[in-house]
Each structure stands twice: as structure tokens, then as C-alpha cells.
């Protein structure tokens, strides 16, 4: 939705007594919870959780290792099946009775294994768009990565590896038209430029740790040469010793002063 249309619609709703004053003034809040997990609060107060690896994540603030402390979750998004993105998602889905939106083949496996019922594991895929809440749209886009589901079979107590589908990133469009591109885990690919040209994200959540994803230099190239988005928050670094990339290295490679890097520590919030 165009931001001006959103403001006009909110003004009418307020004049009719349908929305409180704070709904118009509220900003987009983006809180980093470590790795690729974020708590995003939309302009009307809807809570979006992405890639929730919280309980075992060494970077997650202690309060959020208790899933109930996330509050009411309205939208739950998972980019792929690796445990550092998926681990706590089923529990959050059940706790809030909220669907877990994830790649279609991944959720087919989730249902087949009995991890979640079909109602909490809807299927969609790259280029597909869903509307999990009124005024909020989520589109799945390409990510250059892999995806499997590691699952402990309750009958045998053996660890098993199952199909995780194609990994994705998400374009999250909020009620006021603000667009967030959560890249998921990804390496460089040329269609990042297409994603930027077509969807025009206002904020990119970008992996920088390397080894499993882009490292600092590749991420800086993606930000400055392909995406050219006005705002970037770095993610997917610091939690795994194999992902050695640092925020300082990423900042050092960034050469475009028009792109603002928001240097969040786990638990900190950026407002837009």
C-alpha cells in the first residue's frame, strides 16, 4: 500500500473512532534477537517473528529464551529448515495458534512428520504472496543456499535428515507501505538487483558472517552495487565460530554513505 494512502485511510478510521491516535503515530520497530531472528512490530502493532532460533542461540537475550516473553505473535516466518532458523518456530506456532509461513516443501515435511498440523503449516513458494494479517503482505523470493530439516525421531530417538525444500528470502510489506527484505541465508546472486528494482525495499536484513552465507565483503557489494537500499541491518554473524565475519569488517567494506547501517546488538531496536 502507498504510504500516503495508508495515512489517509488511518485518518478516516480515526475520525470514525475505529483506531486510537497512537496507531497513526507508531513507527516500525525492528528488534534483533541474534542470528536471523527478529521481532518486528508493524505500524498498527502487529508482531512479526522471523527465523526464531532463540533457546539455544548464544546471542539471544535471556528474556527471549522464554518464548512466552515474545508476547502475542501475529505473523511467523521461517526462511528454511536449518535449526538456527527453524528450531523454536513450531513451539511459537503452537503457543500462539499462528501459522508458520515457510517454503512449501519444507512445510510438507513438517506436516508429514507430525511436527505441526496442516492449519499451522501453510504452503507457498518463491514469487508467492500471502496476506497473514490485514494490510501485511509477504512474498517469498530467491535465496542462494540449501535447506534440510534435522529431526529427532520420537520412536527411535535417532537424528534424521529430511527434505527442507528450497530456501527463500521474504519481502515483508507493512500496512504503511514500508518494505523489509529479510534475505534469509544467501550467497551473492545477480537477481538481487531485480529484487531491489521490483520490490524497492526500504530496509534489508542482510547476512554477513560468511562460510554459510555472504561474508562482509560480499554483503557490502550486495548492499552498494545490487540492492542500494537506504537502510541495512546486519545479521547471521557472531553465533557460530565458523561464521567469522564481523560488523566492523562489513562497515569497513561499505563505501556508499547514502546507505545507513543500523549497528544493532542483540536485543536492541531500530525504528523507522
Feature annotation, model-predicted:
Residues 56-57, 83-87, 107-110, 128-130, ...:
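Active-site environment of divalent metal-dependent phosphoester hydrolases
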Residues 100, 114-132, 220-272:
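Binuclear metal-ion centers of metallo-dependent hydrolases, dominated by the metallo-beta-lactamase
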Residues 43-83, 87-94, 117, 147-162, ...:
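Pre-active-site segment of Zn-dependent metallo-hydrolases
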Residues 9-20:
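Bacterial N-terminal signal peptides
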Amino acid at each position: 500500500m502507498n504510504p500516503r494512502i495508508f495515512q489517509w485511510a488511518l485518518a478516516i478510521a480515526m475520525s470514525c473512532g475505529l483506531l486510537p491516535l497512537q496507531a497513526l503515530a507508531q513507527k516500525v520497530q525492528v528488534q534483533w534477537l541474534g542470528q536471523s531472528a527478529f521481532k518486528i512490530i508493524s505500524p498498527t502493532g502487529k508482531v512479526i517473528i522471523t527465523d526464531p532460533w532463540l533457546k539455544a542461540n548464544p546471542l539471544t537475550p535471556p528474556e527471549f529464551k522464554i518464548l512466552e516473553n515474545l508476547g502475542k505473535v501475529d505473523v511467523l516466518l521461517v526462511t528454511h529448515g536449518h535449526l538456527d532458523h527453524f528450531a523454536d518456530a513450531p513451539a511459537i506456532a503452537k503457543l500462539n495458534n499462528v501459522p508458520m509461513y515457510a517454503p512449501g516443501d519444507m512445510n510438507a515435511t513438517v506436516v508429514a512428520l507430525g511436527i505441526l498440523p496442516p492449519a499451522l503449516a501453510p504452503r507457498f513458494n518463491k514469487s508467492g504472496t500471502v496476506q497473514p494479517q490485514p494490510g501485511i503482505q509477504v512474498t517469498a523470493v530467491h535465496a542462494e543456499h540449501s535447506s534440510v530439516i534435522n529431526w529427532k525421531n520420537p520412536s527411535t530417538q535417532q537424528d534424521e535428515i529430511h527434505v527442507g525444500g528450497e530456501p527463500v528470502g521474504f519481502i515483508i510489506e507493512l500496512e504503511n507501505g514500508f518494505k523489509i527484505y529479510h534475505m534469509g541465508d544467501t550467497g551473492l546472486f545477480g537477481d538481487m538487483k531485480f529484487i531491489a528494482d521490483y520490490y524497492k525495499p526500504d530496509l534489508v536484513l542482510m547476512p554477513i558472517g560468511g562460510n554459510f552465507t555472504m561474508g562482509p565483503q560480499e554483503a557490502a557489494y550486495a548492499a552498494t552495487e545490487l540492492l542500494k537500499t537506504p537502510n541495512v541491518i546486519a545479521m547471521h554473524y557472531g553465533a557460530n565460530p565458523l561464521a567469522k565475519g564481523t560488523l566492523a569488517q562489513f562497515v569497513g567494506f561499505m563505501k556508499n554513505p547514502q546507505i545507513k547501517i543500523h549497528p544493532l546488538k542483540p536485543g536492541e531496536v531500530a525504528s523507522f
